[in-house]
């Protein structure tokens, strides 16, 4: 049998119906002794067990929330930083700052979360990254 390229395999899969693809997956799992659901279960386990094992969850976490805990005495600077970090208007940014503790950014990369934390703390706010 000639070796098929990835593109040729994808083209062949595109021509199959969902029922045929489902049967293929079952046969593939039986032939190679693997399960298509295993990677999903492994990826979901750290998220579900995050409360129990804090250290392992922190190592594997790739999305972070930046939470404004308190404003401090430089409220205007904090509002300016919130507007710079988000696409919020003046009123929305002021409402967010007034309602602290509130999330400023959600599900961002570690680098973005650290930059946001540094910027907000530089403006006088107290911030946590979760």
Curated annotation (Swiss-Prot):
Keywords: Ribonucleoprotein, Ribosomal protein. The keyword Transferase does not apply. GO terms for biological process: translation. One of its GO terms (cellular component) is cytosolic large ribosomal subunit. Disulfide bonds: none annotated. GO terms for molecular function: mRNA binding; structural constituent of ribosome. InterPro entries: Ribosomal_bL12 (IPR000206), Ribosomal_bL12_C (IPR013823), Ribosomal_bL12_C/ClpS-like (IPR014719), Ribosomal_bL12_oligo (IPR008932), Ribosomal_bL12_oligo_N_sf (IPR036235). Forms part of the ribosomal stalk which helps the ribosome interact with GTP-bound translation factors. Is thus essential for accurate translation. Belongs to the bacterial ribosomal protein bL12 family. Homodimer. Part of the ribosomal stalk of the 50S ribosomal subunit. Forms a multimeric L10(L12)X complex, where L10 forms an elongated spine to which 2 to 4 L12 dimers bind in a sequential fashion. Binds GTP-bound translation factors. This is Large ribosomal subunit protein bL12.
